[in-house]
Amino acid sequence: MDISKLLKDRKILILIIFVTLSVFLIVFKGLDFGIDLSGGTIIVLKAEKPMSDKEIEATIKIITERLNYNGLNDVVIYPRGNDEIIVEIPKSCDTDRIIKILKQQGVFVAKIDNITAYTGSDVQNVELPTKIPQGETWAYGVPFELTLEGAKKFAEVAKGKAYHKVELYMDGKLISAPVLSPDLADGKPHPQQVITVGAYPPTKEEIDEAMAIYSALKSGALPVKLDIEYISTISPEFGKEFLKGTAIALLLAFIAVGIIVSIRYKQPKIAIPILITCISEVIIILGFASLIDWKLDLPSIAGIIAAVGTGVDNQIVITDEALKRGAGKIRASIKRAFFIIFASAATSIAAMLPLFVLGVGMLKGFAITTIAGVLIGIFITRPAFARIIEEMFKKF
């Protein structure tokens, strides 16, 4: 076998380029692991009643927005059934702060003398918490703007009630009660409003409270009330042990494949390209995961193993066809093998697509890595392997 000739082949060069890029991504960009491997907290939120598909979508969108507004964008959120929302929190995030945000339904009401002046649905613009002039001093709070309709409602309720308290409630809890100034009690619409949480400069607790109010007003109220059903903490030690066990299992699997292939074909050298192709496939899949910032979890690892298993099957099909037809018809035999491989790949992808499109959480992770592995196999690693086999058997 002419190795120097192989290294100049387009299919082999493509494989080498992808493996090199993948190694670069893995080393310098790193891999993200799900909480089942890196540790973290799982929170199960229970809805007070079954939710429709639109309510589930709106709930996840609102929770995601609230967390993003607070700089907590590494949290994974997905539904389970029609009455539960699962929240996965990495160990690097402030779990207590997230729990506080999750407890908010975000129902905002302003009352004067126990009469509703406006609600969260009347709020149209919300600004980030900032310092606000308050007489001769400064306060810290959340400025916001009412719609014209909301401002008119407030004007009607506030008219003639100077120095009465404007009680602001979030989820039934009083969060602020400023005194109504005379200029806001003149019966005219005043869209600009503010919720103060304390004096300026604020404490950390006041900053967190203001951000929670800001995110609740900005995202709107949840369509249904959610309660925390239970909280589960996952130790990172479990993930480390699993990854260690997976690495050992893959190593043993590669050794077993090498031995079985050597016995099956009575040619140990055939096992070498099969093993190199399998290892290359794993590296490219991991590089792809690093590129798209996909969090690798237990099902994702299972998907990688499944893809590698499929890869070994495909390589055996290519090898069998090449040996069966002989040197004179080796190209035709490999072409026939690829017909079988493409049909098998199409079946695998078709089986995974429903999980990818409709699946959430763990199911989606399995589908993504399996589909990625199959596509990487048929377009990158299998053609390279076939070229090696063609060169290896051309004299047979």
UniProtKB/Swiss-Prot annotation:
Keywords attached to this entry: Cell membrane, Membrane, Protein transport, Translocation, Transmembrane, Transmembrane helix, Transport
Pfam families per UniProt: Sec_GG, SecD_1st, SecD_SecF_C
Gene3D superfamilies: 3.30.70.3220, Multidrug efflux transporter AcrB transmembrane domain (1.20.1640.10)
InterPro entries: SecD/SecF_arch_bac (IPR022813), SecD/SecF_CS (IPR022646), SecD_1st (IPR048631), SecD_arc (IPR024912), SecD_SecF_C (IPR048634)
Transmembrane region(s): 12-32, 243-263, 272-292, 298-318, 338-358, 360-380
Membrane protein topology class: Multi-pass membrane protein
Subcellular location: Cell membrane
Chief site of localization: membrane
The keyword Protein transport is annotated on this UniProt entry: yes
Entry GO terms, CC: plasma membrane
GO biological process: intracellular protein transmembrane transport; protein targeting; protein transport
Function: Involved in protein export.
Classification via PANTHER family: PROTEIN TRANSLOCASE SUBUNIT SECD (PTHR30081:SF1), PROTEIN-EXPORT MEMBRANE PROTEIN SEC (PTHR30081)
Similarity remark: Belongs to the SecD/SecF family. SecD subfamily.
Subunit organization: Part of the protein translocation apparatus. Forms a complex with SecF.
NCBIfam families: PRK08343.1-4 (NF006218)
Record's protein name: Protein-export membrane protein SecD
Organism this protein belongs to: Methanocaldococcus jannaschii (strain ATCC 43067 / DSM 2661 / JAL-1 / JCM 10045 / NBRC 100440) (Methanococcus jannaschii)
